[in-house]
Amino acid sequence: MTANYDVLIVGAGISGIGAAYHLHRQCPGTSFLVLEAQADFGGTWRTHRYPGIRSDSDLHTFGYRFKPWTGPPIASAAQIRSYIGEVIEANQLGPHIRYGHRICSARWSSQENLWTIEAIRADSGATVCVTANFLWM
């Protein structure tokens, strides 16, 4: 069975969650899904775990305009992940995110004006098929 969405967002890092927020708030009625390969949100701030990892840009400009950063200008990965998590929680974005879904193909059909995306589920190895009018990467 294929699930159909207006927009498919690739990744639940800071950019993907920002995209999800804007779709949720500014485009009511638009169906969207975020596919994340990892077991949780955070992108780089989840996967890079070396000692002392932190932003190299200040979070006052790197953060979301809709949720101004209130912490220290240069933040740790844990602080950034917490910030992203607050956005997910406060805006009920969780139901739109599927963790453990690694995209293995994305094909555009000019005839149908539609993306067909296939992802592999980490928990079962099953292939999931999603179609979308717009692919946000």
Question: Language-model features: where?
Answer:
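Feature captures the FAD/FMN-dependent oxidoreductase FAD-binding
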Residues: 71-137
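Carboxylate/His-rich catalytic cores and anion/metal-binding grooves
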Residues: 34-43, 131-137
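Active-site acidic short loop of glycosyltransferases
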Residues: 2-5, 131-133
